[in-house]
Amino acid sequence: MSMTRRYSSTQYSNKMSLQSLSSLLLLVTLFFSPAFALKKSYIVYLGSHAHLPQISSAHLDGVAHSHRTFLASFVGSHENAKEAIFYSYKRHINGFAAILDENEAAEIAKHPDVVSVFPNKGRKLHTTHSWNFMLLAKNGVVHKSSLWNKAGYGEDTIIANLDTGVWPESKSFSDEGYGAVPARWKGRCHKDVPCNRKLIGARYFNKGYLAYTGLPSNASYETCRDHDGHGSHTLSTAAGNFVPGANVFGIGNGTASGGSPKARVAAYKVCWPPVDGAECFDADILAAIEAAIEDGVDVLSASVGGDAGDYMSDGIAIGSFHAVKNGVTVVCSAGNSGPKSGTVSNVAPWVITVGASSMDREFQAFVELKNGQSFKGTSLSKPLPEEKMYSLISAADANVANGNVTDALLCKKGSLDPKKVKGKILVCLRGDNARVDKGMQAAAAGAAGMVLCNDKASGNEIISDAHVLPASQIDYKDGETLFSYLSSTKDPKGYIKAPTATLNTKPAPFMASFSSRGPNTITPGILKPDITAPGVNIIAAFTEATGPTDLDSDNRRTPFNTESGTSMSCPHISGVVGLLKTLHPHWSPAAIRSAIMTTSRTRNNRRKPMVDESFKKANPFSYGSGHVQPNKAAHPGLVYDLTTGDYLDFLCAVGYNNTVVQLFAEDPQYTCRQGANLLDFNYPSITVPNLTGSITVTRKLKNVGPPATYNARFREPLGVRVSVEPKQLTFNKTGEVKIFQMTLRPLPVTPSGYVFGELTWTDSHHYVRSPIVVQLSS
């Protein structure tokens, strides 16, 4: 249909300008008026509930009604409140998640009954020889002294994860040989996951994700199934069955298992396709943690996180406090933002925060040059089609006409010229885009293979990926040599050997470059991470809904895959926690953490101090107390225990007022202890930021072993004088508690910055070691 009447261009322009201007003014007025203020999803946190042990459904309905009534006073009506709220946290966490505008959120935050109001923030996922490396077995044999044997492989402990769901058909979650589900379990399974006596729970939480994205709910958001692979990988690492013949495309063949292979497992799906760089949202995480507490889990593994933040506006910190208060041990990943300092996340003192390090297995894929040079690389990709020398080309020399050379060097999409690449081995630089994406771009350009060279930040950390083409990743120094060869040789040629699994490699462990580092930017007086565990090239169960690279064009499928990240180290500790919970069912979460931390090691398999990705000496900001030793954690001798009251005292010591802490605890009688001092918080590590004069630290040790006398030994941090009183502690019975004090003072001439030492209490059988971290001012 055409218009017969028309304006001259000038008439049309003037008329439209006036109309547009008036419309624009109207839109601006409406947009910035209170009625049209931009709405977002928020969490309104009201603290804890003071429920009786048995809660009726009517009581829970009453809690939800009280949330709506409370919100109605700010949004105009009960109906508006009902429409705005998409989660009511009714059982352990007191609060709700709702769609609010900024003004409403600000007004609610002023109410005296409100602890905090904060945006529904997004979190990132922090993406089996390892158990042999940690000495739970040796050459496939489980010895009598193994924690596996002592703890019955974690039998009937219930371990859950917050992740991308689960692939229930995996053999890692088969219930063959399992007895009845523990009677204490109150959880359930969504209809799309066939649960059994091993996989006893599967639920999804999506309202926070949908509220943030504005997407309508559909079948793809109403499932517990794992379409990413991350959740199945982490859950099976924590508590998957023994599965013989596990491998990735024939490489690394062996028996896969989790840390607590006879534990029961539950999956709480809180992570969805990425949006704005995040997959898992606080509103969903809080709802899942509340459900996990009520369902009866013993251990909660969370391989998710974001930037460290204030405890009262951090969904993971809030939820995990309520879990720990109810006896659930919470284990969190430290993050993958290393090696930069001050990047560690999940720093709340009631969670176990886990860094990532290597182990003594590599999937070696050597790169050989025509001139006889050879570089040790790693890969899980298929071999080259022919055993011959191939032409090599630097990706920087393969850029498209008028293209960005840096993009080409990084092998980014659209940066490579197929005419230059076809049939050759392409040499790319690590950084920016995903390692597997570089392989995909190389393959798309027609490369026969790819060598991926580490950038300086990645150092010696090389990661095995199941690339879509023959490939190998080499370290930074070898990469420099290779690029030099390419630039100085007229006809450079090389070959990538087929990958093979190699054991007993040295040095191991060393810290992964990606593992986030301290110091703790929220509370510098608490050392984080707490511990490190294997997190590089970990083979575990995977989904069959996507390929091992998670790229849309990767049509391959594998029941097991290798992944790296603190996401992988976190469930290693969760599995160890499951064993300790089985062996010592009455230990508190703090006692379990103490046992893991104080029995760890800081030396590698060369009996030298652990190193970082550049093979320089590492320190507690990267590994915390050290690398986990499960068998020693079974009988630590002494523990640094903590109660809910201690955590409340901690909050007072770091500056939260009495009213906020009362709401947090749901205890109107609680009063911040006068003189509460962070230096006396009974943490298993000792950290003193900004030491300028003499200070005294107080700690309490609880005997969990037989009667014994312990003597103090210490290694002083450089420039610090240390004394301990008393120097000897005698325990006459199990459960007895003794107090000691450590005094630290700077020497007249001291270095500036952080310095490190350690304190060990020993009865010649047990060695209870704590790192000492001190910041000195020049």
Curated annotation (Swiss-Prot):
A family per Pfam: fn3_6
Domain Peptidase S8: 130-634
Glycosylation sites: 218, 253, 404, 657, 690, 732
Location of the protein in the cell: Endoplasmic reticulum; Cell membrane
Residue stretches making up the PA domain: 401-486
Residues covered by the Inhibitor I9 domain: 41-126
GO cellular component terms attached to this protein's record: endoplasmic reticulum; plasma membrane
Disruption phenotype: No visible phenotype under normal growth conditions.
Entry keyword DNA-binding: no
Record's keyword terms, sorted: Cell membrane, Endoplasmic reticulum, Glycoprotein, Growth regulation, Hydrolase, Membrane, Protease, Serine protease, Signal
Class of the enzyme per the UniProt entry, highest EC level: hydrolase
Predominant localisation class: endoplasmic reticulum
InterPro entries named among the record's database cross-references: PA_dom_sf, PA_domain, Peptidase_S8/S53_dom, Peptidase_S8/S53_dom_sf, Peptidase_S8_Ser-AS, Peptidase_S8_subtilisin-rel, Peptidases_S8_3, S8pro/Inhibitor_I9
Chain segments annotated as coiled-coil in the UniProt record: none
Catalytic site positions: 163 (charge relay system), 230 (charge relay system), 567 (charge relay system)
Expression (tissue specificity): Expressed in the vasculature of roots and leaves, stomata, sepals, stigma, anthers and siliques.
UniProt entry tagged with the keyword Glycoprotein: yes
CDD domains for the chain: PA_subtilisin_like, Peptidases_S8_3
GO molecular function terms listed in the Swiss-Prot or TrEMBL record: serine-type endopeptidase activity
EC number(s) from the headed UniProt entry: 3.4.21.-
GO BP term, example: proteolysis
Its biological purpose: Serine protease. Has a substrate preference for the hydrophobic residues Phe and Ala and the basic residue Asp in the P1 position, and for Asp, Leu or Ala in the P1' position. Interferes with CLAVATA 3 (CLV3) signaling, but does not cleave CLV3.
Note: Plants over-expressing SBT5.4 show a clavata-like phenotype with fasciated inflorescence stems and compounded terminal buds. This phenotype is abolished by mutating Ser-567 to Ala which completely disrupts the catalytic center of the protease.
Name assigned to this protein: Subtilisin-like protease SBT5.4
